[in-house]
């Protein structure tokens, strides 16, 4: 609430590294330093930061669009095995109560999302942007997709999870990747649109011509 109500929506990221990888070693011991915080101070962000941040925003603003992005949201966009808790977890979209995930680099999708919101479209109607993931209770308007195993199947059978992951991995190409649908007991569906197209040479030149701050 200190930030105030945004004009278009909240964009949420855990930073340039998954918060759990940032906080813990592979042996699950707490790290002593945070390389991505000024002074290397640990404890400046919570575990599972995207989930925490989004839920805090949702408790303060019930109807403001929340768009999650960055590596933490991207790698957890569909059901996934969480090494830290040794459990199969749902799409972060559901646990975070976010509206949309912008996955991957996001240079195109974030602009398209902003333009769509600025035009007055409701966040629930923005289902057509490549490089995004959204949730829906009906598949009536979803087309040309591959259906992944239901989340309940993944909990019960490791082989079904392996099959699901193979389909996901096989559809990461921006030119041939299909839309993927992951059901959750038939009550809600998480829909992953195909990956966003890569930047053109001119777009790439524009990005790297920006005045980035260097520390070396």
Question: Can you name each region flagged by the protein language model?
Answer:
Residues 2-185:
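Glycine-rich beta-alpha loop elements in corrinoid/cobalamin-binding modules
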Residues 166-216:
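N-terminal [4Fe-4S]-dependent radical SAM core
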């Amino acid at each position: 609430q200190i930030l105030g109500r945004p004009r278009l929506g909240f964009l949420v990221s855990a930073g340039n590294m998954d918060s759990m990888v940032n906080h813990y070693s592979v042996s699950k011991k707490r790290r002593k330093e945070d390389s991505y915080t000024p002074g290397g101070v640990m404890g400046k962000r919570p575990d599972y930061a995207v989930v925490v941040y989004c839920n805090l925003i949702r408790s303060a603003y019930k109807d403001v669009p929340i768009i999650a992005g960055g590596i933490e949201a991207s790698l957890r966009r569909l059901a996934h095995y969480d090494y830290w808790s040794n459990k199969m977890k749902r799409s972060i979209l559901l646990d975070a109560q976010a509206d949309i995930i912008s996955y991957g680099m996001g240079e195109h999708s974030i602009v398209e999302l902003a333009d769509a919101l600025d035009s007055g479209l409701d966040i629930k109607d923005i289902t057509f942007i490549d490089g995004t993931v959204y949730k829906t209770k009906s598949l009536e308007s979803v087309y040309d997709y591959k259906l992944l195993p239901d989340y309940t199947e993944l909990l019960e059978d490791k082989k079904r999870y392996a099959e699901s992951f193979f389909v996901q991995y096989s559809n990461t190409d921006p030119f041939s990747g299909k839309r993927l649908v992951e059901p959750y007991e038939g009550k809600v569906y998480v829909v992953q649109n195909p990956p966003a197209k890569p930047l053109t040479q001119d777009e790439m030149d524009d990005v790297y011509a920006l005045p980035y701050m260097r520390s070396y």
